């Protein structure tokens, strides 16, 4: 059987685009915590010594946007110009207006509609994906790249590698077999880590520390062999980082947020959006659907698509593809999905408890992926029992 290589990347929380995602979701959390009916579309951009939040927010919440921006930057580790941004002294610009009344009347009828009548906040199509290659039912290439990024942050914050700075990127290439449509990982072919560092550390020390404290604890030994290639800070120098190195924008890391290039993507970003925005809630419910199909044993690998029209509650279409791994025909799996899941936005909000903010609930999603996480706040990761006499776990 012929193998093939597939690559996924990740960035950690100090990457400028991810910093923006986290600020947008921290603002969403603050709004929903005080007012679960908040309508939030919050974008963030950043460059040297500046963060700007802008968008449309309609809420009864009393939110100090500047304070949230500075706290989020500080928590990530942006505490001086040396590391790429000084949370306490950077410029913070705020340009936030109310949601357009045209959108408001079309979507929620100014809160007069019942939950099942609430229309989609916009048109669009979203995809959910699941695969049996990892316990998380996520692609291994994506899981490993994401966990390497999270481990980089962990060893920076706990002092194990004091030379680390907040910005960093990871990338993992996995060798796979295609087993009748299911993906079977064989080995890790290449590991790439580029991390921001201080002036004091040598490239040899960087490579040794990354192998010992980041790669070894994350990548299972069975996937590494003498042929595995390591590119550790291959550019040779990465002192300038964060918003000083690159401009950042909310919604620029949508593949990292989802499935690492596997499955498909409708193009809509997640962060800074309340659950009437189907870019987010629609993607969450189809992940739950795909995961539940694979967990139930109906298929080894699965993608689910849903699509919407603005102001219309019922989805326009639902699609299922099991890549030939289904125990039953895809059209029967589709019927089970339609019976088991309510794709109307108002009902997704209720069933996945998406109006509950605060406590960093959505902030947590904004770094290290929205899917495959073992956390009670990630309600869409709960496997749902499927309604059908054909399901045998």
UniProtKB/Swiss-Prot annotation:
Catalytic activity annotation: L-methionine + ATP + H2O = S-adenosyl-L-methionine + phosphate + diphosphate
InterPro entries: ADOMET_SYNTHASE_CS, S-AdoMet_synt_C, S-AdoMet_synt_central, S-AdoMet_synt_N, S-AdoMet_synthetase, S-AdoMet_synthetase_sfam
Compartments in which it is found: Cytoplasm
Binding site for Mg(2+): 9
MF-aspect GO terms: ATP binding; metal ion binding; methionine adenosyltransferase activity
Tissues expressing the protein: Mostly expressed in flowers, seedpods and roots, and, to a lower extent, in stems and leaves.
Enzyme class label: transferase
Cofactor(s) recorded in Swiss-Prot or TrEMBL: Mn(2+); Mg(2+); Co(2+); K(+)
GO annotation, biological process: one-carbon metabolic process; S-adenosylmethionine biosynthetic process
Cofactor note: Binds 2 divalent ions per subunit. The metal ions interact primarily with the substrate. Can utilize magnesium, manganese or cobalt (in vitro). Binds 1 potassium ion per subunit. The potassium ion interacts primarily with the substrate.
Pathway(s) it belongs to: Amino-acid biosynthesis; S-adenosyl-L-methionine biosynthesis; S-adenosyl-L-methionine from L-methionine: step 1/1
Main localisation: cytoplasm
Gene3D superfamilies xref list: 3.30.300.10
EC number(s) per entry: 2.5.1.6
Induction text: By ethylene, polyamines (PAs: putrescine, spermidine and spermine), methylglyoxal (bis-guanyhydrazone) (MGBG), and AgNO(3).
TM stretches of this protein: none
UniProt: L-methionine binding residues: 56, 99, 246, 277
Residues that coordinate or bind ATP: 15, 167-169, 235-238, 246, 252-253, 269, 273, 277
Keywords tagged on the record: ATP-binding, Cobalt, Cytoplasm, Magnesium, Metal-binding, Nucleotide-binding, One-carbon metabolism, Potassium, Transferase
Binding-site list for K(+): 43
Record has tRNA-binding as a keyword: no
Gene Ontology cellular-component annotations: cytoplasm
Function of the molecule: Catalyzes the formation of S-adenosylmethionine from methionine and ATP. The reaction comprises two steps that are both catalyzed by the same enzyme: formation of S-adenosylmethionine (AdoMet) and triphosphate, and subsequent hydrolysis of the triphosphate.
Self-association state and partner proteins as the record states: Homotetramer.
Family: Belongs to the AdoMet synthase family.
Protein name, as recorded: S-adenosylmethionine synthase 2
Name of encoding gene: MSAMS2
């Amino acid at each position: 059987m012929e193998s093939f290589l597939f690559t996924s990347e990740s960035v950690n929380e100090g990457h400028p685009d991810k910093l923006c995602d986290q600020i947008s979701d921290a603002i969403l959390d603050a709004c929903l915590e005080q007012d679960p009916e908040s309508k939030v579309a919050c974008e963030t951009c950043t460059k040297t010594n500046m963060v700007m939040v802008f968008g449309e927010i309609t809420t009864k919440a009393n939110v100090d946007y500047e304070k949230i921006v500075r706290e989020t930057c500080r928590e990530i580790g942006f505490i001086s110009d040396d590391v790429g941004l000084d949370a306490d002294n950077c410029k913070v610009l705020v340009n936030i207006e109310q949601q357009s009344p045209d959108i408001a009347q079309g979507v929620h009828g100014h809160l007069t509609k019942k939950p099942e009548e609430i229309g989609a906040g916009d048109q669009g199509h979203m995809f959910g994906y699941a695969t049996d290659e990892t316990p998380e039912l996520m692609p291994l290439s994506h899981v490993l790249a994401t966990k390497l990024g999270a481990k980089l942050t962990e060893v920076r914050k706990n002092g194990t590698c004091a030379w680390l700075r907040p910005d960093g990127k990871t990338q993992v290439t996995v060798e796979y077999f295609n087993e009748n449509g299911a993906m079977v990982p064989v080995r890790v072919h290449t590991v790439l880590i580029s991390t921001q560092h201080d002036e004091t550390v040598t490239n040899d020390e960087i490579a040794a520390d990354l192998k010992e404290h980041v790669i070894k604890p994350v990548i299972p030994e069975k996937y590494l062999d003498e042929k595995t290639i390591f590119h550790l800070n291959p550019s040779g120098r990465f002192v300038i980082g964060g918003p000083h190195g690159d401009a950042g924008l909310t919604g620029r890391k949508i593949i990292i947020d989802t499935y690492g290039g596997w499955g498909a993507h409708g193009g809509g970003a997640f962060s800074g959006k309340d659950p009437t925005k189907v870019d987010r809630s629609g993607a969450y419910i189809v992940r739950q659907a795909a995961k539940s199909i694979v967990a139930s044993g109906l298929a080894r690998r699965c993608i689910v698509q849903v699509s919407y029209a603005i102001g219309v509650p019922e989805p326009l279409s639902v699609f299922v593809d099991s890549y030939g791994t289904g125990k039953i025909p895809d059209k029967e799996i589709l019927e089970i999905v339609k019976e088991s899941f309510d794709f109307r936005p108002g009902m997704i909000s209720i069933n996945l408890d998406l109006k509950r903010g605060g406590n960093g609930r959505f902030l947590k999603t904004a770094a290290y992926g929205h899917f495959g996480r073992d956390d009670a706040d990630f309600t869409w990761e709960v496997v749902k029992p499927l309604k059908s006499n054909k399901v045998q776990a």
